[in-house]
A protein has these predicted regions:
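Beta-strand/loop-rich accessory regions of lumenal/periplasmic or secreted enzymes
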Residues: 1-251
Length: 251
């Protein structure tokens, strides 16, 4: 993305991201046929998206430029960008998924080492998990970049993770500001992914960059897998198309 002759390396999206706990079989339950399943209950396997780009449509609509990318044979179906004269970009996207999933949505890439801070209107100041939604408050929050390790460092609130009820979020970087307005009800904004400690006793999550997620993972404890952490920790059964809308501004 270029802004006033400056380059903001926000790219490679939208791309579908979907993952489930690596010890699961296709029916969500523990995979007894896998001899190494027990070793995988702290890791997540990402679904490869076989989507193939088929067509690009470009048209003008009321002074706006509308660019639609169409895909087939995979999860991502369509990404429609509406660009207005001020440089605001509205993304309407559609993807499909049928099956059991612990993490699902769309993602973009941005180099983490360029991030300075974030400010957002939404639930905060803490990140959430599927089984730890409650306890946040809806307000304007702000924090500097940090990358704490549970049990080893005590920097709070954590910068990275999944954030709920986000109306808008501004991510300040060394290259400029990435601003997004979330118009997808019940979607979460993912800011990279939480990092586990040295021994990886809790989770090893797939890299998700800056993401808009319909499903976020639960968190386990050191003893029990997520299956044993209550009803809110169970994976989601998803079937059919999923749609969303997010507006980007780059400053």
């Amino acid at each position: 993305v270029s802004v006033d002759n400056r380059k903001i390396n926000f790219a490679n999206g939208p791309r579908f991201i979907g993952a489930r706990r690596a010890d699961r079989s296709l029916d969500q339950f523990y995979n007894h046929d896998d001899e190494k399943a027990k070793e995988k209950d702290r890791t997540y396997s990402e679904f490869p998206d076989a989507a193939v780009f088929t067509k690009l449509d470009v048209k003008e609509d009321g002074g706006n430029l509308v660019v639609t990318a169409n895909y087939k044979l995979g999860n991502l179906d369509k990404a429609q960008w509406t660009i207005n004269p001020s440089g605001e970009l509205a993304l309407d996207y559609t993807y499909n998924f049928s099956g059991v999933v612990d993490l699902m949505g769309i993602r973009f890439d941005y180099p983490e080492d360029q991030v300075i801070s974030k400010r957002w209107l939404g639930a905060g100041p803490y990140r959430v998990w599927q089984n730890r939604i409650h306890g946040t408050q809806y307000d304007v929050w702000e924090n500097d970049y940090n990358d704490p390790i549970p049990g080893e460092t005590f920097t709070y609130p954590e910068f990275k993770g999944y954030f709920g009820d986000v109306s808008w979020m501004n991510i300040q970087t060394k290259e400029g500001t990435i601003s997004l307005t979330n118009e997808t009800p019940d979607a979460y904004i993912g800011v990279y992914q939480p990092r586990d400690g040295r021994d990886r006793l809790l989770y090893t999550l797939p890299e998700s960059g800056i993401s808009v997620l319909n499903v976020i993972p639960p968190v386990r404890n050191k003893v029990n897998s997520t299956d044993l952490c209550g009803p809110s920790s169970q994976p989601k059964w998803v079937n059919g198309p999923q749609t969303g809308r997010v507006i980007f501004r780059f400053m």
